[in-house]
């Protein structure tokens, strides 16, 4: 069992390069296609403006820059790639990202850095995709990114069919893990 389609989240955070390189490595390892996805709804870091029109334009430009860099790197590394830019408000873009995630074998997301200007937005986005995608997610930490991803794996389990599918779909990562931690989420369904 291997992955055919991998989705990696692109942003202007300090861990973007590590996350993208992990995506390239996994795509090569599994002979998979790698899709880079950027949100044109994120306020670029260090931008100070109250104008929503300026913020939207700068967000779109940032997303275009991220996908251009990703496309160039993918070509240099010989990785089959695609890109997606999601526009819309915060809730709409989160919903779109969740829907896109259903089409991929593995998602590579980031743990939000509390020092990032978009921390609350990234937290909401990550939590929603994590809980609603039903897909295995390689959740890259904002610290310790020099460690080999996939050695320590956490499975969140709530007893649902989507949790079962996600665990089954994560078998290619689980086979190589040195440690697997199971977190059971109890609710009225379990």
Predicted regions and their residues:
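Small/aliphatic-rich secondary-structure junction motif
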Residues: 1-53, 132, 149-190
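A conditional alpha-helix N-cap/helix-loop micro-motif detector
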Residues: 16, 63, 87-90, 119, ...
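Gly/Ser-rich helix-loop-strand patches that form or flank binding pockets
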Residues: 16, 20-28, 96-145
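A structural preference for short, hydrophobic beta-strand core positions in alpha/beta folds
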Residues: 36, 83-85, 139, 182
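Structural beta-alpha unit
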Residues: 1, 72-107
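Short, small-residue-enriched loops and turns at beta-alpha junctions
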Residues: 88-91, 115-116, 187-190
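Generic structural signal for helix capping and beta-alpha/helix-loop junctions
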Residues: 44, 91-93, 116, 147
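N-terminal positively charged helical leader segments and presequences
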Residues: 33, 48-87
């Amino acid at each position: 069992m291997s992955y055919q389609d991998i989705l990696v989240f692109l942003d202007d955070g300090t861990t973007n390069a590590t996350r993208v390189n992990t995506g390239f490595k996994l795509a090569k390892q599994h002979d998979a296609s790698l899709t880079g996805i950027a949100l044109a709804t994120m306020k670029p870091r260090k931008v100070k403006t109250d104008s929503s029109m300026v913020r939207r334009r700068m967000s779109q430009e940032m997303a275009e820059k991220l996908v251009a860099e990703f496309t160039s790197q993918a070509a240099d590394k010989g990785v089959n790639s695609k890109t997606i830019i999601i526009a819309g408000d915060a809730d709409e873009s989160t919903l779109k990202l969740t829907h896109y995630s259903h089409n991929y074998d593995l998602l590579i997301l980031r743990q939000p850095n509390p020092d990032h200007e978009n921390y609350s937005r990234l937290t909401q986005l990550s939590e929603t995709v994590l809980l609603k995608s039903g897909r295995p997610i390689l959740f890259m930490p904002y610290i310790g990114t020099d460690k080999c991803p996939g050695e320590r794996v956490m499975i969140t389990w709530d007893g649902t069919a989507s949790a079962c599918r996600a665990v089954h779909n994560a078998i290619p990562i689980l086979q190589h893990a040195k440690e697997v931690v199971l977190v059971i989420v109890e609710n009225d369904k379990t």
